[in-house]
């Protein structure tokens, strides 16, 4: 038997203690199964009931804690609706405080979206009927209450909203919801030992140390061997994610925010600011387990060090471990080139009617040195027009617009290729970004659109502006 020095014994003891102390999901063998939000597939005339209420969830294993959600479930159901249908919404607020809701990315008038101007008081209902006219996309709904959107969204008032059309279902893409078409809602949180969400309303920005995906920490999912589609939403308040696979495998970026790209883009990494969505395809024909992560690959010792540290890093940066099973898929031996029909690149040749510049001061939560004033209109745009907006910020931050859509023209002076251009409503500002904004929906003084920081902590401090489109 080998002699063990006192120093080695101490190190071994500390390591063993650490292993017993860390959260179970840090150990791959104990990962929970990914929860898939319930699917509400609406058809013409079928109402969509969304009851905002208290409920319970297990954010930590074996600990039930009070959260918020819809229809008795933490987070909301995924709404799937077809283009040219009508969304017959029925919001009901069963919470003890008033709430305003936004459907981010939905192309409709200010009166139908509601947004910050439509506060639902306790026990109040609202039932707008919204025509769905836009191309296939992955949108999301969340609380947007003035000065309280971050807290309410953090508690669980959010969900996915998927739009399809006849053409998008014939493209050969994975489309079995929860099987090979997987929704991933990313949230970072701070919890106490009982699993209760911790939140400070007046802190500058919110960076939680634990990463949750559909309400689960570092989950896994057994999927069919073959091509898998991941729809990823950054629903965090402030944190930006750097998505990649832990084996550095290539994936195909096919869509972002408001629709498909002209053609699939081969990537190893993609950045995702708050409110941004991407759809990616990953080939799992090799049958090997692989994890989608944020940042760089870590070992168990790295995770343990982050668990005992306080550096703003996530304890575990695993988003989802994919465990493929079954026979190889149809794409095993041929390279698929994905082409999609989108009019987004045509905006590059459209006449620009006005140019504007917006600078976000992250430290002071201002846009062009101003905070939100409900009595002041910050942008008045003409219906049907196209404007060029130049966006900059004092430090990296997400930006979002409601009721309109845009394409990214250039990033830090470098123009995007036409094949990379798709419709968006949210973007990361890291330096200077030029976007072309198209206004196809009306808003009014009573129901204005908003634009500004997609970081809801900053938005609650007034880092947004009001927009009239007539």
Swiss-Prot record:
GO terms for molecular function: copper ion binding. GO terms for biological process: FtsZ-dependent cytokinesis. Keywords: Cell cycle, Cell division, Periplasm, Signal. One of its GO terms (cellular component) is cell division site. The keyword Signal applies. Its main location: periplasm. InterPro entries: Cu-oxidase-like_N, Cu-oxidase_fam, Cupredoxin, FtsP, TAT_signal. It comes from the Bacteria. The keyword Signal applies. Residues 1-29 form the signal peptide. It is found in: Periplasm. Predicted to be exported by the Tat system. The position of the signal peptide cleavage has not been experimentally proven. Belongs to the FtsP family. HAMAP family: FtsP (MF_00915). Cell division protein that is required for growth during stress conditions. May be involved in protecting or stabilizing the divisomal assembly under conditions of stress. This is Cell division protein FtsP. It comes from Aggregatibacter aphrophilus (strain NJ8700) (Haemophilus aphrophilus).
């Amino acid at each position: 038997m080998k002699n063990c020095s006192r120093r080695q014994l101490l190190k071994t003891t500390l390591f063993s203690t650490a292993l017993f102390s860390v959260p179970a999901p840090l150990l791959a063998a104990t990962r929970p199964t990914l929860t898939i939000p319930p699917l509400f597939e609406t058809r013409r005339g079928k109402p969509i009931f969304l009851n905002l209420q208290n409920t319970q969830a297990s954010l930590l294993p074996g600990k039930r804690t009070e959260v918020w959600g819809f229809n008795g479930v933490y987070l909301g159901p995924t709404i799937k609706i077809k283009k040219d249908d009508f969304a017959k919404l029925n919001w009901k607020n069963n919470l003890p405080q008033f709430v305003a809701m936004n459907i981010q990315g939905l192309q409709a008038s200010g009166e139908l979206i509601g947004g910050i101007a439509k506060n639902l008081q306790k026990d109040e209902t609202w039932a707008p009927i919204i025509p769905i006219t836009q191309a296939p996309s992955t949108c999301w709904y969340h609380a947007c209450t003035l000065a309280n959107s971050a807290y309410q969204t953090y508690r669980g008032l959010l969900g996915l909203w998927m739009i399809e059309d006849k053409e998008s279902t014939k493209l050969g893409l994975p489309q079995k919801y929860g099987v090979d078409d997987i929704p991933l809602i990313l949230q970072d949180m701070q919890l106490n030992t009982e699993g209760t969400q911790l939140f400070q309303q007046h802190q500058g920005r919110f960076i939680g140390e634990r990463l949750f995906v559909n309400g689960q920490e570092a989950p896994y999912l057994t999927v069919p061997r073959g091509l898998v589609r991941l729809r990823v939403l950054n629903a965090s308040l402030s944190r930006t994610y750097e998505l990649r696979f832990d084996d550095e495998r290539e994936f195909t970026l096919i869509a972002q925010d408001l629709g498909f790209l002209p053609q699939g883009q081969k990537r190893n990494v993609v950045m995702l600011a708050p409110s941004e969505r991407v759809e990616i395809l990953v080939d799992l024909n090799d049958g090997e387990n692989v994890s989608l992560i944020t940042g760089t690959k870590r070992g168990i010792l790295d995770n343990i060090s982050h668990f005992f540290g306080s550096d703003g890093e996530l304890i575990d940066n695993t988003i989802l471990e994919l465990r493929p099973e079954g026979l190889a898929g149809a794409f095993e031996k041929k390279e698929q080139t994905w082409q999609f029909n989108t009019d987004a690149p045509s905006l590059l040749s459209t006449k620009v009617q006005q140019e504007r510049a917006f600078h976000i001061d992250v430290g002071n939560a201002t846009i062009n040195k101003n905070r939100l004033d409900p009595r002041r209109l910050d942008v008045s745009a003409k219906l049907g027009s196209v404007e060029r907006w130049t966006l900059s910020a004092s430090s990296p931050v997400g930006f979002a617009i409601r009721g309109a859509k845009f394409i990214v023209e250039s990033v830090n002076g470098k123009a995007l290729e036409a094949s990379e251009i798709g419709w968006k409503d949210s973007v990361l500002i890291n330096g200077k970004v030029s976007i072309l904004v198209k206004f196809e929906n009306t808003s009014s003084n009573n129901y204005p659109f908003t634009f500004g920081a997609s970081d809801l902590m900053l938005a609650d401090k007034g880092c947004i502006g009001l927009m009239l489109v007539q």
